[in-house]
Amino acid sequence: MGMLPSSGPHLHILLVHIPILGFIVTTIWLYFAIRKNNLCHQKGCWYSMFLLFVVSIPTYISGAASRWNVQYRDDLDVDLGLVFLHQNVALWTILFACLVAILSWFALWRNQRKGDACGRLNWTILGLGAITSWLAVQAGSIGGRINHPEVRTGLYDGAAALPDNLAVAGNPGGFVDFAYNLILGGDQYWRWPAFEALHFIGMALIFGVTLIISLRVIGFAKEHISFQAVHRLLPIGFLGLCINLDTGFLFFIGDSGRYVAMPGFPYKIAALVIAMIVGLYFTVNKRLYALQAGQDATLNDKYVAYIYIISWATVIFFGRQLPYIFGGG
């Protein structure tokens, strides 16, 4: 089944501890930062929340690859009911992590332009961060019992995790099943193409803003345009990113077995992670934000701009060519 399913369990074990511990620590950190009215620490929490979500993306994908790695193996004492329950809680976790990341990024963008804290927005991030932390702990607790029958008790007993017919059918049920039916359910064949259209619109927004910002940093039209002028376009690109993350997760849930079997898929996700981190760099870089019309960016910032263009171009290339390159899936 290719590289990712075979290495999925190992990668998942390495990654999964980062969002679990990270969201707990960052939520507590943000609470005290708000109480002390410390803007510097609040910004640190916003950075952390966004980056933890970025890490959560390959964490969830490697978890799905792990499921396909163990689902049809008879040599492992794995309770599929627990696997599916774990997958459902993990999907809820990454949904709330995405909401936290969206608000955290907006808080950083707003702070860059206005220089103040975000009041109610901060408390909203704190509340969602607490929910995300709780869900992450639950997902981790369930996941830790999958390969350990000696600690399966109560709710975590496989017999109580999901109805037998779901486990036998290989259907995760719950929220995962809802998302699956949203894009593939019944005879509504228009749904997948409709979400594809949304995905293309989102990518157009992302790459359009990426080119405008990167070309300004590289030096195009620097005599007439300040960086602040293009900085205000970032929410448009971020809207495209939100659209693509939502539709992308629906595509993945709808056909995860095929996606994780595609050799080009890990390269797309790696490029996506890089692109999201570089996008954060352009959001919060004060040196770039201070550039006025006629001023040139530093050489290092220009290198970062090239990386930004290349990373999103890589995401687009592998996204389009996944079924055709390296033998498909």
Identify the function of each model-found stretch.
Residues M1-G329:
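Polytopic transmembrane helical bundles with strong interfacial aromatic enrichment
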